[in-house]
Amino acid sequence: MGHIVSLLTVVDIPRLHFASPSATVKVKGPTDSPEDSRRESLESFVESRCPSLYGGFKPASWLFNGHLQTAYAVVGDFSKIDKVDYDRTLLRTLDGGTIGLDSTPPTDERTLPDDTPIVVVLHGLTGGSHESYVRAILAPACTPVEQGGLGYRGIVVNFRGCAGVPITSPQLYSAGHTDDIRVAVLHISRRYPKAPLLGIGFSLGANVLTRYLAEEGQQCRLVAGCAVACPWDLVKNAQRLEDDWLHREIYAKAMASNLQKLMGRHAESLAKFPDHPLTKAVPGVMAAKSLTLSKFDNTITCIGGGSSPPFPFPTCWDYYAWASSHEMLAKVRVPFLALNAEDDPIVQVLPVEAGGNPYVAFAVTEKGGHLGWFEAGKSIGDVRRWVSKPVVEWLKAVGEGLAAQDRQIQPTHVVDGFLKEVGRDDIGCKEVEGGGHVIGVEGEGGLLAGL
C-alpha cells in the first residue's frame, strides 16, 4: 500500500535561483584544445548538465515532511549501501593540531591517473568520512566509469577530533574557521598538481567551504563548489532553534549531545594543556545535564573554535555573526551550486539571491529535511537519497566540462618541513605518522549520524 501511495506522491520540482545575467563559464569544446573552448552562461550550463534539478524529487510517502526526512537520516541503516573505503593521511598544522584526509579509492584497490578530478569533501557538525550522506556522493563519484560511476578520486577532510582524528592542540574546529581546509587543499594540490579540485560541503562543512571560497576569491585552488544543507545565517537559524520548543528540545539538544560526547572522548588529550581556557571549560560542559547547541558554543566553540584572532569571542552570538556565510556568498568566484530544503528543521533562513552573485546557482526543494532528500526506490523498503543525482551530475559537469580557468594561484614552498604558500607564513602543514586503512561504513559509534 505504501508503495502505491508513493506513486501518487507529488513531484517536488526544485526552485532554481540565478543572478540575471548569470556568469559565463569557459567550457571545453570537442577537444581539450584551448582554441576549442567557448563561453556559456552558468544557467545554461546547469540546465543542460544537471537534469535532475529540473526533473524533480519525489519524497518517499512515509517520509512526507522535514522532521521525518531528518529523523531517517539519523536512524536509517545505511551500512549495506554506498560502501567506501579510504586511505588516511594525517596532517600536522603549525599550531600543533591534526586533521585527517581520507582518500578513496585506496591505493591497493586501484591506481588513478594524476589528472583525475578530485572531490574534496567537508562533513557536517560531528561527522566524518563514514557519514552516509558523504558516501552517497563518493560511492557513485568514485566508482569506475566502466561500472557506471565517474571514476573520480575523493578526499574527505576530517576536522580535528572527528572520525577518530586525534586532538593534539588546544584548538578545535568551527563553522567559520577556514585555515584547516586551506592547508588541506594546499596539500592536495601539491600532491596532485594536474587534477581539478572540486569542493563539496555538508551542513557545517558547507558553511566552511563557502567562507573558504569567498576568502580565496580569484586565488582559489578549487575550480568549483557545492554546498548541501548549508546553515548560512547562523544567528537567525540558531535563534529559531532556541525559540521553538520542538526544535530546541530535539535538534539543538541532539547536536549538543554529539558535541558533548565528542569532547568527552578528547578530554584526556586536552588535559595535556591544563592552563588553556578551552581545557578549563571542558568540565563544565561535560557536567551539563540539559545542553543545547548555543550553550555548548557559548562555553566551548567561542573559545576554541579557531585560531586567535578572532577567537575567543565574548559570546556564541558574536561567534555566529562572524562565522555566518550568507553575506560571504556574494564573494565566491568559482561556479557554485547550493542545495537546501525548505522544510529543513535546522536551516530555515535561505539567502537564495546570493547577494546577486552571478557564479551561484541556488536550488531549493520544498521537501527533504536536513541532509535527507529520501525517495522510494524500485522495491518496497528501498530508500535512496535523491540529492546524490544532481550533485553527481554537477561534479561530472564541472570536473569534465569546464576548461582551464585563468586564476591567480600562489606558489608553494616547504619551510622547516611545513608546506606553505609563498607570502603567507602563519599557516602550513606536514604529513605525520598515523592514518592507515579506514572502512567508511563502520562510522563513529555513540554519536547520532546525519547531523
Predicted feature locations:
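Catalytic active-site module of serine/aspartate enzymes centered on a nucleophile-bearing elbow/loop
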Residues: G368, G372-G450
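Alpha/beta-hydrolase active-site loop
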Residues: P170-Y192
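Short, surface-exposed "cap/lid" segments of acyl-processing enzymes
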Residues: T93, T98, D102-T168, H187, ...
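Catalytic histidine neighborhood in serine/cysteine hydrolases
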Residues: N357-W373
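Active-site nucleophile elbow and catalytic-triad environment of alpha/beta-hydrolase enzymes
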Residues: C302, S308-M328
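Alpha/beta-hydrolase-fold enzymes
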Residues: H3-T31, Y192-S308
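N-terminal cap/lid segment of alpha/beta-hydrolase-fold proteins
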Residues: W62-D114
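Short beta-strand/loop motif that positions the catalytic acidic residue
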Residues: V332, A338-N340, D344
